[in-house]
């Protein structure tokens, strides 16, 4: 499945499950080295509820973001922006 097919499928699923605006929860696993956690957090506005927790060995940080999203397109755009950060796993 190509990236575009994946995002089209995700859009369909999001529209089936959510009505907008909605509080959407993003979850990411981010390598703790460097400023990658900061880069992920910086992609969301100050109104977002962001929590993070480092793994027991400190190699990774889980980042959870709860934020009001206005459309499935806006959610997909955030996923695409985060995907540009090397090593981030999107759950």
Predicted features and spans:
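Long, contiguous binding/interaction regions
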Residues: 1-62, 68-91
């Amino acid at each position: 499945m190509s990236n575009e097919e994946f995002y089209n499928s995700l859009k369909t699923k999001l529209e089936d499950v959510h009505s907008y605006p909605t509080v959407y929860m993003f979850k990411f696993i981010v390598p703790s080295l460097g400023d990658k956690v900061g880069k992920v957090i910086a992609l969301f506005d100050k109104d977002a509820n962001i929590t993070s927790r480092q793994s027991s060995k400190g190699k990774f940080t889980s980042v959870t973001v709860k934020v009001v999203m206005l459309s499935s397109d806006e959610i997909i755009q955030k996923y695409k922006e985060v995907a540009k950060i090397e090593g981030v796993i999107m759950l």
